[in-house]
Amino acid sequence: MCGIMRVYRVYNAYKIVGAVIFSMSIIVILYISIILHSLKLSFSIILAVDILIIALFAYIFLKPKKLVVLDNGIKVDNEFYSWDEVIEFFVSLNSIQINLKGKREETFNWETPGLFKYRPQIEYVVKKDAELLKILREKIENKERKRG
């Protein structure tokens, strides 16, 4: 039976902690620039190495994680999980946590102004969307962890 997979929503969850780590790349660049300068390399070589390091840090630490909600499961980045593999999901005031079989809990925090100031451990930030909750409740209603 060949069916077309319906994509409900695609969310790009941005790495907040990655932005902080990315800012640390400036220190790495300064350190490497000093070392290259002491080796008497030309300014253009030092600049090229610095740009390469910035690009590498940006790719590694700022790449968003993609959450795709499909009719037969969810995809987190390139890994597909059927609805049967979703152990539970938990909605809180600032996040949605999705527990998946064979994988640690995936947490997607709602995009809230000033939230990073109070919770520096936040990793992925996604725009809050009632449609996402509606779809999850429809597909796996018996797996929602309730408070209390």
From Swiss-Prot:
GO cellular component term of the entry, any: plasma membrane
Swiss-Prot/TrEMBL keywords: Cell membrane, Membrane, Transmembrane, Transmembrane helix
Recorded topology in the membrane: Multi-pass membrane protein
TM annotation in the entry: 16-36, 41-61
Main location: membrane
Presence of keyword Membrane: yes
Subcellular location per the Swiss-Prot or TrEMBL entry: Cell membrane
Family: To M.jannaschii MJ0696.
Name this polypeptide is given: Uncharacterized protein MJ0275.1
